[in-house]
A protein has these predicted regions:
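The feature encodes the CheY-like receiver
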Residues: 13, 55-56, 84, 102
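Charged docking surfaces used in two-component/phosphorelay signaling
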Residues: 14-22
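Alpha4 helix (beta4-alpha4-beta5 surface) of REC/receiver domains from two-component response regulators
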Residues: 17, 61, 83-98, 115
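Short hydrophobic/Thr-rich beta-strand motif most characteristic of the beta2 strand and flanking loop
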Residues: 24-31, 39
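Acidic catalytic/metal-coordinating carboxylates
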Residues: 32, 58-62
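Active-site beta3 strand of CheY-like receiver
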Residues: 43-49
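C-terminal output helix
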Residues: 86, 104-114
Length: 126
């Protein structure tokens, strides 16, 4: 599965990238929102994992762009330190499929990604 990770914190980005690659995924990284928006158009990933607060474009803009992409359903997991209810609700209203608050467990992220991989491949449960 091809996963786009949009995260401006380099340590966090490398942690997520390492875990996803270890799980066998093709990982595309974006260091800011603008790069992520360009990558959505260029590569059309199966899944996006995005932070909310990033330079140039926010994770909320990334969710909107992913959900407007024609021809392909792109699932979005938000991974953010912003756990305020209004932010979480806005993310879901824009079309986020999941929301994980930092700090997070790499094992939990791995299991959630696995769940989306199974859904994408047509299997509905673990």
């Amino acid at each position: 599965m091809t996963i786009l990770v949009a995260e401006d914190d380099m340590i966090m980005l490398k942690t997520i990238e390492y875990r996803l690659k270890k799980d066998g995924h093709n990982v595309i990284v974006s260091h800011d929102g603008r790069e992520a928006l360009e990558e959505i158009e260029r590569s059309s990933p199966d899944l996006i994992i995005t932070d909310i607060m990033m330079p140039f474009s926010s994770g909320l803009e990334i969710i909107s762009a992913a959900k407007k992409k024609n021809g392909k359903k792109i699932s979005v997991i938000v991974l953010s330190a912003m756990g305020q209810e209004n932010v979480v609700l806005e993310a879901f209203q824009l079309g986020a499929d999941d929301y994980i608050t930092k700090p997070f467990s790499p094992n939990e992220l791995s299991m959630r990604v696995k769940r989306y991989e199974l859904v994408i491949s047509g299997v509905q449960s673990l």
